[in-house]
């Protein structure tokens, strides 16, 4: 189905080839500079005939709206911490929508809005030039054209893709055979990848959070809270017990612009539609990275759908509290977690897709799910309702039709706090997943941390009507179903899913799960002598630099599932007017003829442009 959008791609390529480069600094109308920060002073209206440079951290504030039309490309400079830059003392480009700002980013299929890197190509090479100091963007980009960018769109028409950008390698990992496959001997944790090439997109709202200023069961005053026996003083700019300052920013200078959270669940930060966020995740400091898309206290008045995060150095999408509802979300080939939830997130989600790398160094949890950063030792969980108690917002997101695919046997070898599972449940998390497909984690399917058991046993964690397969080496045994996390290695909570609730403290929370049926059709798995070491693994990328296909790897079709899944009538009915009734499991319509309709990822994602599928 790629060819159906080729004319749109040609138009997008032509526009991009003729685009000018515009830097969003203090010389741009409606933007001021204070120290190293950029702030809006009026509404910003971009045009798709230019490509825009984020020269640092740009804050949308002062009740301004940042308007981005379809087909626009926005590029962040690589910061000094990026492996693709030189110099010191400057941060990468990021766009931050503060609580008093709005974003209006409405792309369309065939002309998405793309956030990516402003890294320039080395002279005479297609690789990024790592010797450039980007601290003076006006000088760096003087005399440059869009064809000088590392990921220029000028080759789009030649490749015949339906996306506005060309196929790009997500990694510079070496290969050790003629097909470009990667083995353990060819990789290590120091190998550079096409990540950390700019910052990311951050949206901050005024919806409730459970930021964690809690000592036992008491909300702590004066911006101080106790966790794990330690008293933590917070920045003085926060004046509410459930306000926080978002990670990934230089906090002392940013001040209140970085705050999120508040009392308004219906708060609106604007609109994101058909937006692809690529190659970001700059490190500001140890444990202070920027996610591809960060949403702090974002309310359900915000519209977020058709959003992709591709090849980010940190998490793909992270929710810090808030109530925002999302659908048609894709996280592909990111280094850390795919969907991370923290601090009392209560939004709804549908059609979420995760596709992790099989390069052995990328991809942590598909879902790292935390409740709140609080000390629960004195909270009487059995007396707390499923939503909140005494002002404490407890997490309870509800997700329908997710497809999460880990890296399989060739997933991440660099373990994070134990094992890399499809899910980690901790910090008093509660929430629900229905009608989904979860497969191919390198380690166990679910790890329940020592501080995740209480709400699990209360029935506040729900997994119903889902398919699970290929998680850990033995794939389908109870012993391999759960990974270990934290000091408690004997609690077998995750077996409740494997046993469909039999013997569980809350059996109804884990009914109608299937753990012995491979959800994917044989065409989606590798087999044959040409690449026997990968037999049984999910097919990954089939695009290589020469423009040919890998016959042995083929392409993965996320709508192509086994007959057992396609014919399964056990579908849990939707529970909210937000959800779209869907008579199938997973993120893609498996009931329809897969050859006669597009995947919802086609025509705007890197997942599509890189030929991950054969469509």
State the predicted function of each range.
Residues 1-19:
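Gram-negative bacterial Sec-dependent N-terminal signal peptides
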Residues 106:
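Conserved H-D interstitial segment of serine endopeptidase catalytic domains
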Residues 73:
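Catalytic metal-binding/acid-base residues of hydrolase active sites
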Residues 20-61, 66, 77-100, 112-314, ...:
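Extracellular beta-rich repeat passengers
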């Amino acid at each position: 189905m790629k060819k159906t959008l080729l004319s749109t791609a040609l138009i997008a390529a032509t526009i991009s080839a003729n685009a000018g480069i515009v830097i969003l600094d203090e010389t741009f109308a409606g933007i001021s500079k204070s120290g190293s920060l950029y702030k809006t002073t009026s509404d910003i209206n971009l045009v798709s005939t230019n490509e825009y440079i984020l020269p640092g951290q740009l804050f949308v504030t002062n009740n301004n709206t940042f308007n981005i039309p379809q087909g626009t490309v926005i590029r962040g400079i690589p910061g000094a911490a990026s492996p693709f830059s030189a110099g010191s003392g400057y941060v990468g480009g990021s766009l931050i929508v503060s609580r008093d700002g709005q974003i209006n980013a409405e792309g369309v299929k065939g002309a998405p809005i793309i956030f990516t890197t402003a890294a320039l190509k080395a002279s005479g090479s297609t690789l990024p030039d790592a010797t450039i100091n980007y601290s003076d963007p006006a000088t760096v980009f003087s005399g440059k054209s869009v064809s000088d960018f590392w990921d220029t769109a000028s080759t789009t028409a030649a490749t015949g893709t339906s996306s506005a950008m060309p196929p790009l390698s997500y990694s510079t990992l070496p290969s050790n055979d003629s097909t470009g496959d990667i083995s353990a001997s060819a990789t290590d944790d120091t190998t550079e990848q096409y990540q950390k090439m700019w910052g990311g997109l951050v949206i901050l709202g005024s919806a409730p959070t459970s930021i964690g200023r809690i000592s036992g069961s008491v909300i702590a005053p004066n911006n101080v809270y106790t966790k794990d026996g330690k008293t933590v003083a917070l920045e003085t700019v926060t004046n509410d017990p459930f306000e926080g300052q978002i990670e990934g920013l230089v906090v002392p200078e940013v001040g209140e612009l970085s705050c999120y959270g508040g009392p308004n669940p219906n708060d609106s930060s604007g609109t994101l539609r058909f937006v692809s966020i690529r190659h970001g995740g700059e490190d500001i400091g140890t444990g202070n990275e920027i996610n591809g898309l960060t949403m702090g206290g974002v309310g359900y008045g915000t519209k977020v759908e058709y959003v992709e995060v591709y090849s980010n150095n940190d998490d793909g999408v992270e929710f810090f509290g808030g109530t925002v509802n999302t659908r048609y979300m894709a996280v592909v080939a990111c280094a850390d977690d795919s969907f991370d939830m923290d601090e009392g997130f209560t939004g709804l989600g549908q059609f979420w897709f995760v596709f992790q790398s099989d390069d052995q160094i990328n991809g942590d949890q598909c879902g790292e799910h935390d409740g709140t950063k609080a000390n629960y030792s004195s909270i009487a969980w059995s007396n707390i309702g499923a939503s909140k108690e005494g002002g404490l917002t407890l997490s309870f997101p509800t997700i329908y039709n997710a497809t999460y695919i880990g890296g399989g046997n060739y997933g991440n070898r660099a373990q994070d706090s134990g094992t890399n599972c499809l899910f980690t449940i901790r910090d008093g998390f509660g929430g629900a997943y229905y009608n989904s497909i979860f497969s191919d984690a390198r380690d166990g399917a679910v790890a329940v941390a020592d501080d995740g058991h209480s709400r699990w046993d209360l029935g506040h964690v729900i997994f119903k009507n889902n398919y699970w397969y290929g998680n850990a080496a033995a794939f389908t045994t109870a012993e391999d179903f759960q990974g270990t996390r934290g000091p408690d290695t004997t609690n077998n909570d995750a077996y409740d899913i494997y046993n469909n609730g039999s013997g569980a403290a809350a059996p109804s929370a884990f009914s109608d799960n299937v753990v012995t049926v491979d959800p994917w059709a044989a065409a989606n798995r590798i087999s044959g002598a040409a690449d026997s070491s990968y037999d049984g693994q999910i097919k990954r990328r089939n695009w290589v630099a020469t423009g040919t296909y890998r016959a042995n790897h083929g392409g993965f079709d996320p709508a192509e599932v086994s007959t057992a899944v396609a014919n399964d009538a056990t579908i849990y009915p939707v529970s909210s007017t937000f959800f779209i009734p869907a008579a199938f499991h997973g993120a893609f319509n498996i009931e329809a003829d897969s050859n006669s309709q597009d995947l919802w990822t086609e025509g705007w994602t890197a997942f599509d442009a890189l030929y991950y599928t054969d469509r």
